[in-house]
Curated annotation (Swiss-Prot):
Belongs to the UbiK family. The lineage of its organism: Bacteria, Pseudomonadati, Pseudomonadota, Gammaproteobacteria, Enterobacterales. Residues 59-86 form a coiled coil. One of its GO terms (molecular function) is identical protein binding. It comes from Escherichia coli (strain K12). This is Ubiquinone biosynthesis accessory factor UbiK.
Length: 96
């Protein structure tokens, strides 16, 4: 889901931005920050970049198929309209 290295980087940046007195708590504070970040990020409904890219491709293929189906329906509707316009041979008067 989320790269643990990114979480560590964010935790380290937050830790480094703290005043010196607080920073002296050392790794304990960094661990707590990392745990809190991880807990908060897992609550978010996030997807990985790979999952996002896969779903983007699926959506593109679906749109292409939809466009083809719409075109096919239009062609069939036009053909149906043309057939309806042609006179019915059974209702025509007999020719001699």
């Amino acid at each position: 889901m989320i790269d643990p290295k990114k979480i560590e980087q964010i935790a380290r940046q937050v830790h480094e931005s703290m005043p010196k007195g607080i920073r002296e708590f050392g790794e304990d504070v960094e661990k707590k920050i990392r745990q809190t970040l991880q807990a908060q990020l897992t609550r978010l409904d996030l997807v990985s970049r790979e999952e996002f890219d896969v779903q983007t491709q699926v959506l593109l293929r679906t749109r292409e198929k939809l466009a083809l189906l719409e075109q096919r329906i239009s062609e069939l509707e036009n053909r149906s309209t043309e057939i309806k316009k042609q006179p019915d041979p059974e209702t025509l008067p007999p020719t001699l």
